Regions:
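Positively charged n-region of N-terminal signal peptides that target proteins for export
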Residues: 1-4
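Bacterial N-terminal signal peptides
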Residues: 6-15
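Sec/Tat signal peptide C-region and signal peptidase I cleavage site
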Residues: 17-21
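Extended soluble regions of mature proteins
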Residues: 22-232
Length: 232
């Protein structure tokens, strides 16, 4: 699966930057897809303190990352619940029996974005290709850092529940992707596209920097029941 030249050229045409003097954050739009379902749009709103992801509505459900406290909240208005994940803790270390390799390649023919040549990364575990990404180094750093923090928090939570995960699911790709190298691409750049061999795909459609953000987007609703994630 390739991130085509035409797709990158299209992205270059839709990128724009706000000139509002009250610059506070970045908004990104990705097309995301799981195996067997149609792609859907996801909006990521990033500030210095928070990252919110939703499907574009200020009123619907959303996922909120408190960056300083390393806490994740998944808000579901339909049943008035908030799933809480505590992302604090030590990142799990790669066990000796698991070999994790990150392969890196550059195609100079691909158009540059923000002056940088996109880089292709491949996550390989025990010689099996598990995940691929095309990233842009040194661009949209605040958003990249927030996405990495989110991935790390989920990795810590996954490590707490690993013992309850059936052994047949604990494949080298599962372990590397969700525990030991979940941020393999996010530590190097903002993803233009990432995908797995099982049908997951996420592709950057558009972004806007210098956005005046509504603080209310980062507030949890009152009166919702909080459910603690397992493992705590």
């Amino acid at each position: 699966m390739k991130f085509t030249l035409s797709a990158l050229s299209g992205l270059l045409l839709v990128i724009y930057t706000a000139v509002n003097a009250g610059e506070k954050g970045t908004v990104l739009w990705y097309a995301e897809q799981e195996a067997g379902i149609e792609p859907y749009k996801v909006r990521y709103i990033v500030s210095r303190e928070f990252m919110r992801s939703d499907e574009g509505s200020d009123e619907g459900g959303f996922v909120l990352l408190d960056r300083a406290e390393q806490q994740i909240y998944s808000v579901v208005p339909q049943n008035r619940t908030i799933l809480h994940i505590d992302g604090r803790g030590e990142l799990p270390q790669v066990p000796p029996q698991l070999s994790v390799e990150i392969k890196r390649s550059i195609d100079e023919k691909v158009p540059r974005l923000a002056g940088q040549v996109p880089v292709t990364l491949e996550l390989v575990a025990n010689q099996e290709l598990c995940y691929s990404a095309i990233i842009v180094p040194g661009h949209l750093e605040q958003a990249r850092a927030a996405l990495r923090e989110f991935a790390q928090a989920l990795s810590i939570q996954q490590s707490r529940t690993l013992a309850a995960t059936p052994q047949e699911y604990q494949t080298p790709c599962f372990l590397s992707r969700y525990l030991y190298a979940t941020d393999f691409h996010l530590k190097q750049g903002i993803p233009l596209v990432d995908w797995s061999q099982q049908g997951h795909r996420r592709e950057l459609l558009d972004y806007q920097t210098g956005v005046e953000l509504d603080d209310g987007l980062f507030e949890l609703p009152d009166g919702f029941a909080t459910i603690e994630a397992s493992g705590r």
